[in-house]
Amino acid sequence: MYKDLEGKVVVITGSSTGLGKSMAIRFATEKAKVVVNYRSKEDEANSVLEEEIKKVGGEAIAVKGDVTVESDVINLVQSAIKEFGKLDVMINNAGMENPVSSHEMSLSDWNKVIDTNLTGAFLGSREAIKYFVENDIKGTVINMSSVHEWKIPWPLFVHYAASKGGMKLMTETLALEYAPKGIRVNNIGPGAINTPINAEKFADPEQRADVESMIPMGYIGEPEEIAAVAWLASSEASYVTGITLFADGGMTQYPSFQAGRG
C-alpha cells in the first residue's frame, strides 16, 4: 500500500476493461479517487464502478470519451477537476492494435492506431500538464507503452511499433521539459498480458505456447501484475522520471530480441 495515494485524483483512459480496469481497481484500493474512462460501452464502465471499485470502498466516476477527439480529452480532465476538485495523476492507457501487412495497410489503418496510441496519449499528457503548470502541482503522467517501443519489431504491426516508439521519445521529451517544475512523466512497457485485446491470440494453444517460449519467466502476465503502476504514481518514485518500466517477464531480455527479432 502507498499511503500517499489516498485522496489523490487519478484519470485513467480506456479503463473499463483490460489493463485500465485493473489499474482503476488498484488505485481505488489505495484509496485514490478514480475517473474511469470508456469510449462506447457504458455498461462495462458502470460494472467497474459498481462491482469492483465500490467493493473495495473506493470512490470513482465514469466519463465517456474518445481519446482521438481533442474535446473529449479536455472534457475528461475537466470532469475530474469538477467532480473531485483537482487532478494528481494522468494515466494514458487507451490503445489499440490491428495487425495488417505493411504493403496492404491503408492510411486509415495507420491513422487509427497512431491517433489512438500516440496522439491520444499526447492530448492526455498535454491537458494534465497544462493543469499542473497552471496550478503549481507536482503531478504525474504515466503512459502505457509496450515492449515494442524499443527492440522488438514485429511483422504486421508497423503502425503499432511506430506509435509506441514515438511514445518513448514523447515521454522522455516531456519528462525533460517539465522536470524543473516537479512534474514526472514515465512509461510502463507491458509484455504479453492476458487482456481482451490478446484474447483471440492466446486462446490458440499453438500461438500461446509460441509467445510463452519467448518469455524467460515462462508465463503470460495478468493485468493485476501491471497494476503495480501505482508505485510510479507514489512518492516512493519521486525521483523517477523519463523512464520506461518494463513489466514483461524478461521478454525484452530474450536473446533473439536482443539481436532485433523481426
Swiss-Prot record:
<dbReference type="GO" id="GO:0047934">
    <property type="term" value="F:glucose 1-dehydrogenase (NAD+) activity"/>
</dbReference>
<keyword id="KW-0521">NADP</keyword>
<dbReference type="InterPro" id="IPR002347">
    <property type="entry name" value="SDR_fam"/>
</dbReference>
<feature type="binding site">
    <location>
        <begin position="11"/>
        <end position="35"/>
    </location>
    <ligand>
        <name>NADP(+)</name>
    </ligand>
</feature>
<feature type="active site" description="Proton acceptor">
    <location>
        <position position="160"/>
    </location>
</feature>
<dbReference type="Pfam" id="PF13561">
    <property type="entry name" value="adh_short_C2"/>
</dbReference>
<dbReference type="InterPro" id="IPR036291">
    <property type="entry name" value="NAD(P)-bd_dom_sf"/>
</dbReference>
<feature type="binding site">
    <location>
        <position position="146"/>
    </location>
    <ligand>
        <name>substrate</name>
    </ligand>
</feature>
<dbReference type="GO" id="GO:0047935">
    <property type="term" value="F:glucose 1-dehydrogenase (NADP+) activity"/>
</dbReference>
<comment type="subunit">
    <text>Homotetramer.</text>
</comment>
<protein>
    <recommendedName>
        <fullName>Glucose 1-dehydrogenase B</fullName>
        <ecNumber>1.1.1.47</ecNumber>
    </recommendedName>
</protein>
<dbReference type="InterPro" id="IPR020904">
    <property type="entry name" value="Sc_DH/Rdtase_CS"/>
</dbReference>
<keyword id="KW-0749">Sporulation</keyword>
<comment type="similarity">
    <text>Belongs to the short-chain dehydrogenases/reductases (SDR) family.</text>
</comment>
<dbReference type="GO" id="GO:0030435">
    <property type="term" value="P:sporulation resulting in formation of a cellular spore"/>
</dbReference>
<keyword id="KW-0560">Oxidoreductase</keyword>
